[in-house]
Structure formats: structure tokens, C-alpha cells
């Protein structure tokens, strides 16, 4: 019924997969679909950060290999859950483009943000297990969290500042020792669980961050808060991932 309502509102013909007899096209498709792995799959432009944007031809092999080698970086817990992602970065950028292919490969449910201004509300609706971000977005989240926490006043502000101080000292793999981890557990229950709920990230398992350098304090804060941030580096020409950290191979 929802599809019927949508069809009534658009001017273009609308087809639903259930109404199509795709099997009748199988032999016809086999006769002309001959895609070589080295053929161009997409033509994208670089961001122009260090010079004039240039066009980049990426082959099917480029993208497929990037997908296959990126999947092991997904925390294993995600593979056994309903995998929901929120997409807000432009798909004309290779970072988001490749991840969309990856999402389809593993059967993820993709939710699209309405706009940059509604990301917080969209996170609340989607309740994603993973989403992609850029450092500027995480910076805005961080600034808003700190401002609200300190504005609470009294005991609440004191507890928040204590938790914030702990978070900014976070080190991966329990390097700060058992006493620190015990205190962090308390901070997560008292403060950071509320932060995750406010951001719509109760179910989050990974935030893939790229396109610019991530400030160490942001990495420490969000990881301490139970919002794992994985920072990647890549180029349009490398389709795009070159390196990414993860808790599969510990290290920050």
C-alpha cells in the first residue's frame, strides 16, 4: 500500500520487483552482459584539496577488491546482527560510493539522511549499527555534548566533567590499567549511556571516519563513550581505502 501511495504521487512509471518476471530475461541477459573486471565501473572526480580536481576511472576490480579487503575491518559482532547504516555523505565521493557497494554486498539496510541539518534526528530514527562520518561532524557532536553537560550545573556538571576527563585520557586495549577501566565503566553508566541515547547511537558498533585527519581527543572521547570510531585513509585513485584501524587488530 505504501508503494501504491508513492506511485500515485510521482509522474514516472513505477514498477515493483514482485510484479516483474525477471526469470524470462535470464537467457537474454547472458547473451549480452559481458563485463570485464578491468573495465571502467565509475568515473569520479577527486576533491581538489591539493590542486585542480581530476577525473579518475575506477575498474570493477578496483572496487571489488576494496570491498573484499574492507569487510574484515567490520567488527565481527555486526555480521550476526541486523546491519543498519545511515548514509549522509555524497555518493559522488568514492568513500561513500564504495561503502554503498559494501553495504549491498553484505545485505545491510541503508537509511538516507534527509539533510545535513537533520542528521541528529535521522540517527534517532535509524538507530544505526554503523555510519560514516567526517571529523567535522564528530567535532560538532563533541562540542554540543560538552556544552550541554557543563550547562547542567551543580552535581550533574561535576559528574560530567569527571567523565569527560576520564574520556580524554582513554587509551586502547586497556592500556590505562584495571582501575581506570573500572572508573570508565561507571562513567559509561552514569554519563555516556545518556550521550549515546541522545545521539541515537544506542546500537552503534562502528563509526567509519575519513576525508580528513581526526583529532586524537575526538578519537579518545568517542571510543571511551562506547562509540567506536575507526579512522581510515585513502585516495580517490585507490578506490579509496588504503589503511584503517580497528579493534580486530588493536591499536589507535
Residue ranges of model-derived segments:
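Conserved AMP-binding A3 loop
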Residues: 41-67
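Adenylate-forming
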Residues: 3-10, 55, 66-73, 138-152, 193-202, 216-220, ...
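Conserved S/T- and glycine-rich ATP-binding loop of Class I adenylate-forming
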Residues: 40, 46-49, 85, 90, ...
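Conserved pre-ATP/AMP-binding loop-to-beta segment of ANL
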Residues: 25-45, 52, 78-84
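Structural core segment of the AMP-binding/adenylate-forming
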Residues: 1-23, 30
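Conserved ATP-binding loop and adjacent catalytic segment of the adenylate-forming AMP-binding
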Residues: 180-182, 203-209, 214-252
